[in-house]
Amino acid sequence: MASYALPEGFSDFDMFAFGSALLVGGLLGFFLNLISVVAFLRVREMQTPNNFFVFNLALADLGLNINGLVAAYASYLRYWPFGYEGCQIHGFQGMVSILAAISFLGAIAWDRYHQYCTKQKMFWSTSGTITCIIWGLAIFWAAMPLPAIGWGVFDFEPMKTCCTLDYTMGDRAYISYTVTITVLYLAFPIIVLQSSYSSIYAYFKKTHLFKALLFCWGPYTVMCVYACFENVTFISPKLRMLLPVLAKTSPIFHAVLYAYGNEFYRGGIWQFLTGHKSAEHKK
């Protein structure tokens, strides 16, 4: 059997520990979101234009869970077994899932604002159009670092068992791409979430939705933005690996907060799991 050298800064225990964290987080998020997806498909009462955003958020998170499980598998092997092309596919698929998920957070916030404040009804034509635009833009922006285009580069994380945007490049292409993505997919969604939920504070007297986004993606984004100005390789490889692992826990928070914590969605999940309508779903 071939022997592979461990990545610099990582021991066998580190590889096992990070792999286990990715495995546990990936499996938990996968099953939580899978139940959410199947419940939407099986329970007719759940199939509303509003819930369609939550359904698509779960689909995007399933993609990120699968991405993390692939990284967990490679971590247990101690090397990346899928070659250069596999790295590009892994980076692209993960980026599509991330960008789509964050976009659907903004779409759900916008929908709830109109649901509670303007009392405007959501139509399938509107929900479907927004969903197509979100997925289309996610694919478009995620494709930019692919070799055929070359705006940014997908490469290995420090542990060499998963692929993402290479933040160690620090060149003009990386800087312009990172700034663009940060503005479009972090700053803008944060503004939408903050303004929408502030307007309906009487109904949502909690800030968990906003805090979850910052907790999962804030540290990783700070490092990527910092890499636009300084070389980040001085940061410990373990810390640089910890940040994307933390970001990959976002599907768990999304499932709990947006599906299982949603009064318009959890009743359908309960009905799917038990065969009985919940009290709030009967109202």
What is the predicted function of each stretch?
Residues S11-S20, P49-I108, H114-M122:
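Extracellular TM2-ECL1-early TM3 structural module of rhodopsin-like
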Residues F30-L41, N65-L69, V96-K119, T131-C132, ...:
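Cytoplasm-facing ends of alpha-helical transmembrane segments in multi-pass membrane proteins
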Residues A2-P7, Y79-M95, S127-T131, F140-A187:
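Loop architecture of class A 7-transmembrane GPCRs
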Residues V225-L239:
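Extracellular/periplasmic helix-loop-helix junctions in multi-pass membrane proteins
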Residues F215-V225, M241-K283:
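Seventh transmembrane helix
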Residues M1-F31:
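Extracellular N-terminal segment of 7TM GPCRs
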Residues G26-G29, N56-G68, I130-A142, T182-I190, ...:
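Alpha-helical transmembrane segments of multi-pass membrane proteins
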Residues F104-Y116, P145-E157, V179-A227, L257-A259:
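Class A (rhodopsin-like) GPCR signature focused on the TM5-ICL3 interface and adjacent 7TM helical core
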